Amino acid sequence: MDSIETHAKQLGQQTPLPASPEAAQLDRVPNPHADTDYLARFTAPEFTSLCPVTGQPDFATLVIDYVPDRWLVESKSLKLYLGAFRNHGAFHEDCTVGIGRRLVALLEPRWLRIGGYWYPRGGIPIDVFWQTGEPLKSVWLPDQGVAPYRGRG
């Protein structure tokens, strides 16, 4: 099996926030349990990007669930990649689906889903959901745990 050091290039050193999501380096590490179906979850409760029209900040909670195959995403590189959206202008749907697709291209997981729970803009919350196909029946798939947005009342 490949060593972690050859794949986790940013781990253990000071790494600046990438200038853009495209410039961000996502790292992967070998999955020591590639023979086992299990779910890994990442939750980013303070995700930010910019509206591509107004430049105003948009805020979301992202929940990424995946069933790994040979590769795991290295969490520091994922944190830096998601942080690179802070000054990136894109619509909610583009951010959410684009993140999911980039992870699928990197990891080639057995299954992946992403939920983007966006705070209201113009009084309308936008939730975006994307997945690669049917979830595996052998894996416990908990609810993403993000309550529907409720205004006052």
From Swiss-Prot:
Gene3D superfamilies assigned to the protein according to its UniProt record, in alphabetical order: 3.30.1130.10
Biological process (GO), any one: tRNA modification
Stretch list, region Disordered: 1-30
Pfam family, one: QueF
Pathway the protein contributes to: tRNA modification; tRNA-queuosine biosynthesis
GO CC list: cytoplasm
EC numbers: 1.7.1.13
GO molecular function, one term: preQ1 synthase activity
Domain of life: Bacteria
Subcellular location(s) of the protein: Cytoplasm
InterPro entries the record matches: GTP-CH-I_C/QueF, NADPH_dep_7-cyano-7-deazaG_red, QueF, QueF_type1
Catalytic residue positions: C51 (thioimide intermediate), D58 (proton donor)
Keywords, sorted A to Z: Cytoplasm, NADP, Oxidoreductase, Queuosine biosynthesis
Reaction catalyzed: 7-aminomethyl-7-carbaguanine + 2 NADP(+) = 7-cyano-7-deazaguanine + 2 NADPH + 3 H(+)
Keyword Transcription regulation: no
Binding site for substrate: V73, E74, S75, H92, E93
Database matches in NCBIfam families: QueF-II (TIGR03139)
Family: Belongs to the GTP cyclohydrolase I family. QueF type 1 subfamily.
Function summary: Catalyzes the NADPH-dependent reduction of 7-cyano-7-deazaguanine (preQ0) to 7-aminomethyl-7-deazaguanine (preQ1).
HAMAP family assigned to the protein according to its UniProt record, in alphabetical order: QueF_type1 (MF_00818)
Entry protein name: NADPH-dependent 7-cyano-7-deazaguanine reductase
Native source species: Methylorubrum extorquens (strain PA1) (Methylobacterium extorquens)
